[in-house]
UniProtKB/Swiss-Prot annotation:
It comes from Homo sapiens. This is Protein FAM178B. Residues 70-113 are annotated as: Disordered. Residues 75-90 have a biased composition (Low complexity). PANTHER family: PROTEIN FAM178B, SMC5-SMC6 COMPLEX LOCALIZATION FACTOR 2. Pfam families: CANIN. InterPro entries: CANIN_dom, FAM178. Belongs to the FAM178 family.
Length: 679
């Protein structure tokens, strides 16, 4: 055999390496310029390999550092060189795909970029990136570890390319490093470094399912909360021991306070439909064809005449308007607002025209009678006890037309407070116009009955929080029209004091009369004193006809207004024998006594404020201040368990301060010594 030369074994190996370089170069260029179908080979690569492509890797000579065969060992080069894209051999293929240069503005690869936030591997890659940046500087030992971490699919693929299994590791490393160098040469906005990110519809569907599950859990939790709120906790209540009960009663706060609004009375019952109003045209003679058509029409068409304004053309500016038409319009004031507004406007214009068209000496205007006013209130839903109360003006057992039709079946839908207030406002304004235009239209008995009726109906529960300006103006006019004034004052005060049995309602009734005229001031003072005497059972001790004795009478009644005396006065029913209910009954009795004392003290303040305090009455007012402080202020023992006591004591303090201010303004003049008096 021929002797083998020392370098003869290197030529075939170099040729094989050159072929492998050419093959890997083509593969790397193919990976760079491939479309969406050709990027499947780059998908299994790990993120660490791609991160290493961006850092220059210092390598030993692959031939020196990886080959242990004695024939493959040649002269070693001591210097290290970086592995870069320039060191890779140029491929010999004539059709070389164009690679995008780093300086180009637009990419040559227009394939859609991957949506990185849809891939769940992004967070894992971001956590692993800092540790993998140092792969390029660890030398051959790191490359061996890197080669050992390659996926098994990639190893199997490169082993199939070469039949010699023993050279799989060098070829694999060399192919990997050349591919990394080609990826490092790609620009930042190309496909390099993002091979692991791709659109994943399964992840979107999974996220949608998770959101649906969260919404279902939230719905179930809300249902459980509703079920917890609807549980009957009384079944789980355990009776407290005496020690626990005493502890709870010691630190419990009572919710019973003195209400700022009066409770009211049930006056207007609900009606489903208003009572029918029929125009009595039997005595009317038509003066025109249009009027004859109106009088002969059914009630529904007559209302259409009113809404269309034809009645204004027929009866406006006429000297003698039919009384039956005025009565029909007055009853229509109780209908819903869309009808009552037109009726009120026409009725007002007709009365005003009558005032200006008739001469002063022969002026006669139509005014609704007391009975017609009661019928109007009955049409609004007022029941008979409110219209015909037991008292000085009891009218017997007469039943108004349509009274039998008012039953419980018709009381289903309560009338709206606003609609009721609008109808009452129309009635108040029209009555005020009549009282102002013709003061002598009503007698004193009718005036007092009308005042009582207005005060009684105004205490309705639905009207408590609504303003009553029109009512107050009407009451002032009715008081001024009473001819026997001060003779009717005692009778009027006694009548009004029985309008309600509740002290707070009577206090609200006193406040219906504004403190504006001398008659209203005197009525407020006398009525307040009568209500105080009635609540204390001392009606016989009041000389109502003597105005100057009101402060002295109030001084005697103030001593009976202490809470302890009121508690004894209200304790007509003995406490229940059960000891468990005795503390509760005692607390309710204390609240009632303080509530009554609060109303009586408010009425006492009205009595004093309506007086014209003179220097002669300075001593009586000073005595009232002393009794207020002695019988009420010092008798109230505040407690966190009884807020009504605190409210009563606050009112007593405010009243005392107000009376002290009056004392400073009406203090009598001091008598000074004059040595020249007897000269």
């Amino acid at each position: 055999m021929w002797p083998r030369l020392p370098g003869a074994g290197l030529a075939p190996q170099l040729r094989r390496q050159d072929q492998r370089l050419h093959f890997t170069g083509q593969m790397s260029h193919g990976l760079q310029m491939a479309g969406p179908q050709e990027t499947v080979l780059a998908l299994p690569l790990r993120e660490g390999v791609q991160a290493a492509a961006t850092v220059p890797i210092l390598l030993y000579n692959l031939e020196d550092g990886l080959s242990d065969h004695p024939l493959d060992q040649g002269p070693r080069c001591p210097a290290r060189r970086p592995c870069s894209p320039a060191s890779a051999p140029a491929p010999t293929s004539p059709k070389k795909p164009k690679i995008q240069a780093p300086g180009e503005t637009f990419p040559t690869d227009w394939s859609p970029p991957p949506v990185e936030f849809l891939n769940p591997r992004v967070l894992q890659a971001s956590r692993e990136a800092p540790a993998q940046r140092w792969v390029g500087v660890v030398g051959p030992q790191g490359l061996r570890r890197l080669a050992g971490e390659l996926p098994e699919e990639l190893e199997q693929e490169h082993l199939d390319l070469d039949p010699k299994r023993g050279l799989a590791l060098p070829e694999k490393l060399f192919w990997n490093t050349s591919g990394l160098s080609q990826q490092a040469a790609a620009p930042e906005f190309s496909w390099g470094g993002s091979g692991s990110y791709f659109n994943n519809l399964d992840y979107l569907l999974q996220e949608k399912r998770e959101q649906a599950l969260e919404q279902e859990r939230e719905r179930l939790l809300l249902q459980e909360c509703l079920n917890l709120n609807s549980l009957d906790l009384d079944e789980e209540e355990v009776p407290l021991t005496p020690e626990h009960r005493m502890l709870v009663e010691k630190y419990s706060v009572s919710l019973q306070t003195i209400p700022p609004v009066h409770p009211g009375e049930t006056v207007f019952l609900p009606r489903c439909h208003p009572l029918p109003c029929i125009l009595d045209s039997s005595l009317l003679k038509p003066r025109s064809h249009l009027e004859g058509l109106f009088l002969s029409s059914p009630p529904a068409q007559q209302l259409s005449f009113l809404r269309s304004g034809l009645l204004n053309i027929l009866y406006l500016h006429m000297p003698d308007c039919p009384v039956s038409l005025l009565q029909w319009l007055f009853q229509l004031l109780t209908w819903p607002p869309e009808t009552s507004l037109g009726a009120f406007g026409l009725l007002w214009d007709l009365i005003v025209d009558g005032i200006f068209l008739q001469p002063d000496e022969d002026k006669h205007l139509w005014c609704p009678s007391l009975q017609e006013v009661r019928e109007a209130f009955h049409s609004l839903g007022a029941h008979s006890p409110a219209l015909y109360p037991l008292g000085p003006f009891w009218h017997g057992g007469r039943v108004l037309p349509g009274e039998a039709g008012l039953n419980e079946n018709e009381e289903q839908d309560a009338p709206q407070e606003i609609a009721l207030d609008i109808s009452l406002g129309h009635i108040y304004k029209f009555l005020a116009l009549c009282a102002q235009a013709q003061p002598g239209a009503y007698t004193d008995e009718n005036l007092m009955g009308l005042i009582e009726l207005l005060c009684r109906t105004s205490l309705d529960v639905g009207l408590r929080l609504l303003p009553k300006v029109d009512l107050q103006q009407l009451l002032l006019l009715l008081l001024e029209n009473i001819r026997e004034w001060p003779g009717k004052l005692q009778e009027l005060c006694c009548t009004l004091s029985w309008v309600s049995d509740h002290h707070h309602n009577l206090l609200a009734l006193v406040q219906f009369f504004p403190d504006m005229t001398s008659r209203s001031r005197r009525l407020r003072s006398q009525l307040s004193l009568v209500v105080i005497a009635r609540m204390l059972g001392q009606q016989e001790m009041l000389p109502l006809w003597q105005e100057k004795t009101q402060l002295s009478s109030l001084s005697r009644l103030l001593g009976l207004m202490r809470p302890s005396s009121l508690r004894q006065y209200l304790d007509s029913v003995p406490l229940p024998p059960c000891q468990e209910q005795q503390p509760k009954a005692s607390a309710e009795l204390d609240h009632k006594a303080c509530y009554l004392c609060h109303s009586l003290l408010m009425l006492a303040g009205v009595v004093v404020s309506c007086q014209d305090i003179t220097p002669d009455q300075w001593g009586e007012l000073q005595l009232l201040c002393m009794q207020l402080d002695r019988h009420i202020s010092t008798q109230i023992r505040e407690s966190p368990q009884a807020m009504h006591r605190t409210m009563l004591k606050d009112l007593a303090t405010q009243t005392y301060i107000r009376w002290q201010e009056l004392l400073t303004h009406c203090q009598p003049q001091a008598q000074y010594f004059s040595p020249w008096k007897d000269i």
